[in-house]
Swiss-Prot record:
Cellular component, GO annotation: cytosol; DNA helicase complex
Binding site for ATP: 28-35
GO MF, one annotated term: 3'-5' DNA helicase activity
Protein encoded by which gene: addA
Name this protein carries in UniProt: ATP-dependent helicase/nuclease subunit A
NCBIfam families: addA_Gpos (TIGR02785)
Description of how the protein assembles with itself and partners: Heterodimer of AddA and AddB/RexB.
Cofactor: Mg(2+)
Job description of the protein: The heterodimer acts both as an ATP-dependent DNA helicase and as an ATP-dependent, dual-direction single-stranded exonuclease. Recognizes the chi site generating a DNA molecule suitable for the initiation of homologous recombination. The AddA nuclease domain is required for chi fragment generation; this subunit has the helicase and 3' -> 5' nuclease activities.
Gene Ontology biological process terms, A to Z: double-strand break repair; recombinational repair
């Protein structure tokens, strides 16, 4: 049978299509044609005699799986039409008929199929419903957690007549005076982390071991030696490097030599500490670090300009050393050993209790899901792995024999659990795993993706086919963008990305190579632009972040207006000619959805059509905030902020002066009582025209509120919400606002969420409001995208949502966004590899004390977080840089 050879493929692409018989890792830069290569490899396998239903093709999203299936079908049709041999044509048509049932899917879909086919291996009920709605899962989990939490508060998990005092201490440690949401947060997050591991129970039970106190002392413990000591030694090494530079500077002038003795003393002390680090006890660490601290700054004579420059540099080095030594003392050795050991023990007991609570909740949640015949996505992977891991598993043997090759797309975004599942279904003799990805584009760390899996194979795999166990193939050509885009992307990466920061060195193998040679050379290349927004002092506002957000949106809007007014020309690849730019050619990309509301507002003012491709910040939209405030008021009107929000909204329509009049009439009561008093004491002769307007609006609103509260007590929430839409005309009102269709879709989404809430057996407005608040806290959007795909409008989306897309003009906004370290400000810190670190609350002294695991994990996570945020920015440039084919303003 004919073998597929594409003259347009590069040698590397053709190698990725042809080579087999061993594991292959394809490092494919964005725009390098990896999807075409994957499809061609599948077709090549078919032409060589492999049936398409003996391939497992794993993609990261359902959309990618659908696209892959469609492209394979199209390629088979094309090959069938071109085939001249009847036998070949018949075989290709046969394979085309097998594609709909072939295993081309996400890993979750594959896991689902494994469970449905081999449920009996683990004695599982084959009848279940997939809990695919995140909000529905959260709702069920919340309900189970409330039961478990109350049982702990009622001492139901201890022997009769015993008090579960440790649970109260646990709740107090992670909560505040208002509620115990902090405990809820850590239990839910612990469960998510545990479920991302191949053995959740084992992972949880390991957490308290970090708090064990060795009989030989704190510094003799494995945790101190493995986790704390490297941090201390790294800091001391940095101090020694700074001291070495200071020593060299002191030798540049006789006047600076007065620093030499001090430098030498501290150098010797720190060198000795590093040499003895593994054997030093707690007190020795405290004492020797204190002794190593630099003394007061030295006074020098009047210096020459060059001497002053060197002195300033020298002093900066010494100040840095002082600060680092003092930070070590204040962070790790602030207490003596006995006090620190006691904190470790007390915190360890709380962590042990926390693990027990989490396991109890996990068991109860699993039992409730089984009772309701439900599975969530984490269950799919866990149960699939269990089925494949059973000794002499028929499922593992079946799939290893069935699949002639396993192809994994976006391999850089897999996690260890998914990697374990993939390895279970691949063959050992010969190896048959084909992986495609790009570590520079791994932007799913928040989903516990582990790019180090890709990196390790990248470093370990052989670079030639002769090394038969494994092979690494690099696809570096970018077939999307013009040369100026490639050059700028490479410039950024070469400055910022290396082995320490970005999992690999940005060398010639990683750099983008120009491959889009279809662009005509005679047409001018548009430069990459950097748009700077500078606020004049007299124009500055009280909120700098608000000022920055508005400023950059306005700057982009003006730049787009100029491009459209000037009729800027772009190259159309389909038409193969230059044409005037259209709105649909432009996309705005941002790391988050934070500026979407500004964009909608300001682009409307500038007359620019815009479509939000990603769900916007749903709970921040005006219409949703008003509805949530109204629901809160219906549930409990004695809440000033929600009540004033509703009164100020279009539903009632009071302005600032009218609201002030109500408050002036009653300065002491809550606002709801003030409204009552205003109506009760109303005197048409005294209040004037303004008061008459207020009275009219309040009377109408109070009648509505009374009606709504009656409905809330007697009817389902969905009836209440729909009645609000009808009686107030609010749904129609928002339809006339900018982006009206999207706003109406948002209100419909709230109605649909209430429907799902009650269909799952949950009741009550108060509980529904709590559920929505929980969604808000976890940033779970409910917005329904408006179908405007064919509209000539500017697209707005996140970097995540843009992968694989292509636009002639891309505006990358919010590039000055600071690193997000919010996770490090809580009373606990979690890391899949480092475990759990908690801040211990001494209830008697009302003192919060970081534990050693908290300090170690925070230090490592802060470094990792900064690296991840930097990498995310770099990867944004890579993703953006390879979806632009004409102009790229930032």
């Amino acid at each position: 049978m004919a073998i597929l050879s594409n003259p347009q493929f590069t040698p590397s692409q053709q190698a990725a299509v042809d080579h087999d018989g061993h594991d292959i890792l394809v490092s494919a830069s964005a725009g390098s044609g990896k999807t075409s290569v994957l499809v061609a490899r599948v077709i090549q396998k078919i032409l060589k005699g492999t049936d398409v239903d003996t391939l497992l093709v794993v993609t990261f999203t359902e959309a990618a799986a659908t696209e892959m299936r469609q492209r394979i079908q199209a390629a088979l049709r094309d090959a069938s039409e071109k085939a001249t041999e009847p036998a070949v044509k018949q075989r290709l048509r046969q394979q085309l008929s097998l594609v709909p049932t072939a295993q081309i899917s996400t890993l979750h879909a594959f896991c689902l199929k494994v469970i449905k086919q081999f449920y009996y291996v683990i004695d599982r009920d084959p009848v279940f419903r997939l809990l695919s709605d995140t909000a529905e899962r959260l709702l069920l989990a919340d309900q189970v957690w409330q039961r478990v939490r109350e049982a702990f508060y009622n001492h139901e998990y201890v022997k009769e007549n015993e008090q579960d005092t440790l649970f109260y201490e646990l709740a107090q440690n992670f909560s505040n005076d208002r509620n115990d949401d902090g405990l809820t947060d850590i239990v839910f997050e612990l469960l998510d982390f545990a479920n991302a591991n191949s053995n959740p129970v084992k992972w949880l039970n390991k957490l308290p071991k970090s708090y064990a106190v060795d009989e030989a002392g704190l510094t003799a413990s494995d945790y101190f030696q493995e986790k704390i000591l490297p941090i201390l030694q790294q800091t001391i090494t940095e101090c020694l490097e700074a001291l070495q530079e200071a020593e060299q500077l002191s030798k540049t002038s006789e006047n600076l030599m007065i620093y030499a003795p001090q430098i030498a003393t501290t150098q010797a002390a720190l060198t000795q500490i590093n040499a003895d680090a593994k054997t030093l006890n707690w007190q020795a660490w405290r004492q020797q670090l204190t002794d190593a601290q630099l003394g007061p700054a030295k006074r020098t004579k009047k210096l020459e300009p060059d001497e002053q420059i060197n002195k300033d540099r020298l002093k900066a080095d010494l100040d840095d050393v002082k600060k680092k030594i003092q930070t070590l003392l204040d962070t790790y050795f602030v207490f003596d050993e006995a006090t620190t050991a006691n904190i470790q023990r007390q915190a360890g007991q709380l962590v042990q209790k926390l693990v027990s609570v989490t396991l109890t909740f996990r068991e109860a949640f699993q039992a409730e899901k089984e009772r309701r015949h439900l599975l969530d996505f984490s269950d799919l992977e866990q149960l699939c792995l269990t089925i494949l891991s059973v000794e002499d598993s028929p499922a593992r043997a079946f799939y290893q024999q069935k699949f002639s090759e396993v192809l994994v797309d976006e391999y850089q975004d897999t996690n260890p659990l998914q990697e374990t599942i993939i390895q279970k279904v691949t063959s050992d003799h010969p190896r048959n795993l084909f992986m495609v990805g790009d570590v520079k584009q791994s932007i799913y760390a928040f989903r516990l993706a582990d790019p180090s899996l890709f990196k390790n194979k990248y470093n370990e795999f052989g670079v030639t086919e002769a090394e038969r166990d494994s092979e690494r193939i690099i696809l570096a050509e970018n077939f999307r963008s013009r040369r100026n885009i490639d050059d700028f992307t490479n410039l950024i990466f070469k400055q910022l990305m290396d082995e320490n920061l970005g999992e690999l060195d940005y060398d010639e193998n990683a750099a983008l190579q120009y491959g889009a040679r279809y662009y005509p050379d005679q047409h001018p290349t548009a430069p990459t632009e950097l748009l700077l927004y500078e606020t004049k002092p007299e124009e500055a506002v009280a909120n700098p972040q608000l000022d920055k957000s508005e400023g950059q949106v306005v700057a982009v809007a003006k730049r787009i207006q100029a491009m459209m007014t000037n009729g800027e020309q772009i190259w159309d690849k389909k038409l193969e000619k230059m044409r005037p730019i259209e709105y649909r050619d432009i996309v705005l990309l941002a790391p988050t959805r934070g500026n979407n509301l500004f964009i909608l507002d300001y682009f409307k003012r500038f007359g620019l059509p815009v479509v939000i491709k990603d769900a916007q910040n749903y709970f921040q939209t005006t219409e949703v905030q008003i509805m949530l405030a109204l629901l809160q008021v219906i549930d409990n009107p004695n809440q000033d902020i929600p009540l004033v929000s509703v009164l100020r909204s279009p539903i009632v329509g009071l302005n600032e002066n009218e609201l002030a009049l109500i408050r002036i009439n009653d300065k002491t009561d809550d606002y709801y009582q003030a409204v009552f008093n205003f109506i009760d004491q109303y005197n048409e002769q005294k209040v004037g025209h303004l008061g008459q307007q207020v009275m009219q609006k309040l009377t109408h609103f109070m009648a509505l509120l009374t009606s709504f509260r009656t409905i809330a007590r007697q009817q389902p929430i969905v009836d209440l919400i729909w009645t609000i839409y009808q009686e107030t005309g609010f749904l129609d009102y928002v339809g006339g606002m900018p982006a009206g269709r999207q706003r109406q879709a948002n209100l419909h989404a709230l109605y649909e969420r209430a429907t799902a809430y009650e269909e799952n057996g949950f009741k009550g407005l108060f509980q529904f409001i709590q559920f929505i608040e929980r969604l808000q806290k976890q940033d779970k959007d409910l917005a329904q995208p408006t179908s405007l795909e064919n509209q000539d409008a500017i697209s707005v989306m996140t970097i995540h949502g843009s992968k694989g897309l292509e636009f002639p003009v891309v505006f990358l906004i919010d590039t000055s966004r600071r690193f997000n370290q919010q996770d490090l400000q809580r009373s606990y810190v979690l890391d899949n590899h480092g475990g759990l670190g908690v801040v211990y609350l001494d209830s008697q002294k009302r003192l919060k004390v970081p534990t050693l695991p908290e300090l170690a994990i925070t230090a490592q996570k802060r470094k990792k977080l900064r690296a991840e945020e930097m990498l995310k920015t770099i990867r944004c440039f890579d993703t953006c840089g390879t979806m632009v084919n004409h102009r790229w303003p930032l």
